[in-house]
Amino acid sequence: CKCFFNDTNNVVYLTIPSASELLFHETGHALHLYSVPPMLLVPFDYAEIVKRVRQNPKTLIAVENFVKEYKKITDNIEEKFRQKADKIYDDFLNDKEYRKRIKKTLSNLIDDKKEKYKDLQIPEKQLNMIISEMYTEEEYINCQKRIFINENTESNMRTYYGGLLAICDIIDAIYEGKLSNGLLVNAQGKKIDSTSGHGIQYYHRNVKITFSEIIANFAAIVKLPDAEENLQILKNIVGEEMYNMINNFYCQDILKLHIEELDGIKSYGGKR
């Protein structure tokens, strides 16, 4: 993980240079736990408001429309890096030294897998055939291309569209991870395309975790470029009631308390 918040010691760790979106998100977690008393980490009316949002058919329509636009962006970025990957690896395949390295890598992989699977008591000839078909030069190149495309697409999204990623995860939290797991359906029962997000397994843990992610994502949106536009997009999707609950909690319960802490420090000449 490039950037994460440790809630046992309230420290944000940045392991390597990371995207601003990640840093602002994890700092949002820290502010949430630092500024708000444990018993007030979730608004008292959170469950009721979220329930109304989920039951509102207009919200689902807004989510589906947003996801369609989001997918256009990600698909265009993926296609750009797919074309780049094709060119890079086509050039590599014309390099004799690179081809030799691939063959050596594949040979080592095949030997490792033979050793790993020998206890399955598969006849040696059959095992060799299975493993050799799994680890071909073509599959190795395709795998490297997929890694290149996925990593660069994610990096590009976090750098230039971090606010949209945060919106996706807020929606994912509201629908308990169904969006990112591809299980959210529209009024006609058709699946809505999946987006980034923490997923069902994470969001089924408890309400505090879910709301903490909503606040952390909101904090990231506020700090990132195009904040005003992205906040309006979020408001149009989740509705005024849900948006106001998040915004009021962030501005009043978190930032207000944090300012009071700073004022307290100032009144003591910078010392506690």
PLM features: residue spans?
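Active-site-flanking segments in enzyme catalytic domains
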Residues: 1-272
